[in-house]
Swiss-Prot record:
Annotated InterPro entries: AAA+_ATPase, ABC_transporter-like_ATP-bd, ABC_transporter-like_CS, Metal_Ion_Import_ABC, P-loop_NTPase
Source organism per UniProt: Ehrlichia ruminantium (strain Gardel)
Gene3D superfamilies, per database record: P-loop containing nucleotide triphosphate hydrolases (3.40.50.300)
Record-listed ATP binding positions: 56-63
Intracellular or extracellular location(s): Cell inner membrane
Coiled coil regions in record: none
Top-level taxon of origin: Bacteria
Residues of the ABC transporter domain: 24-241
Key word Amino-acid biosynthesis present: no
Protein name, entry field: Zinc import ATP-binding protein ZnuC
Role played: Part of the ABC transporter complex ZnuABC involved in zinc import. Responsible for energy coupling to the transport system.
Amino acid sequence: MFHNLLGKNKIFSHHDRYVNDYIINVKDLSFAYAKKKVIDNVSFQVKFGEIITILGPNGGGKTTLIRILVGIYKNYLGIVEYAKNFVIGYLPQNFSVNSLIPMTVEYFLVSSYTKQRKKLNLNSVLKDVNVVKILNRQMSEISHGELQLVLLARCLMLNPDIIILDEPVSCMDINAKDSFYKLINQLILRYNLSVIMTSHDLHFVMANSYRVICINKSIYCEGSPSEIVKNEKFLKMFSSYA
């Protein structure tokens, strides 16, 4: 879906994918806006089945990194490698719905189907993400939390290998956040997924991530939640924007 990115891109074979378990390999990645560097020499790998959360301050490069991974930003320096026949489901930070265009949730999802990719059973996806009860409602009338679930269902319809989410719970209350993260963990097992997401919610990040990457233009530290909470660089970075 996003293999045709510019830059020094490579595609792993399926054999390579399962030998080393990596589905994304980022090496020496840099990106600049108007000569101002916002990503500086970033390298990391994503293993099959991981939940990785990217933490960092506003303006630290989290969203830029996500947009590079999904193919929106292409004029980067460095290498981004993907597994062969690799499909990404993307849930952006800001998704606007035109209230002047009548569109039910059901129509929005059905119209998202594409013939180029084998799709999962729609009814199964709708039940798993718990959006059946809002199918007849207008897209412009649903809450932000419901919109995130609809977008998540749309991602799953692509039968992706990984879902990349940019600040998916930023406008949810604490109960909705808890439910959303529990759902993500269930979907990983049911759909055989990997997940990358950005977040500011330290408590939920530590409870629901396999690995945490702390970024402020470059990577300050990374590791499991238990490792990160003991890292001085992490403590210093988080205290500055918490």
